[in-house]
């Protein structure tokens, strides 16, 4: 079991504390099943966080076809490429707690103004509508949307993954995340500590 080594430094209060953002991976679902899940959870807008909004293996989730299907269910669609994955890791990365190069690259990208502006755009929609962030991967812990979830959590926003038509799962912040205000980083020191087998003990630093 990982020790919870999440550090939170100076989290600022925000009007977004009562806001909830849903997440979902389209995976290999039929479009009808996908729509039923969205409707069951009252989703009003899908925010597509794929870098490239198309799928050769699941063409029903290519941007144009998906947007048409959503319109029929009166659900809005927005692609925000600035939240997309596939970001290269920096040689001087401060996020070496991630052994996975893809996640480390996205964590590096999270330090940029482009990411912050794109996330703010997402939050502006979430203030008005129930949004669901959508990517391709079935489970969030294999997808960069889990890191987006960390960034939203740092801003006081509740994040829940759609699991079924009747159930969601609360997002768990990455155990080795270091949160300072709204900045999230993943230092190696915290990762090494969190991976050490021990009882789960939460630590918060103010």
Predicted regions and their residues:
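Residues lining hydrophobic/aromatic ligand-binding pockets adjacent to catalytic sites
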Residues: 3-206
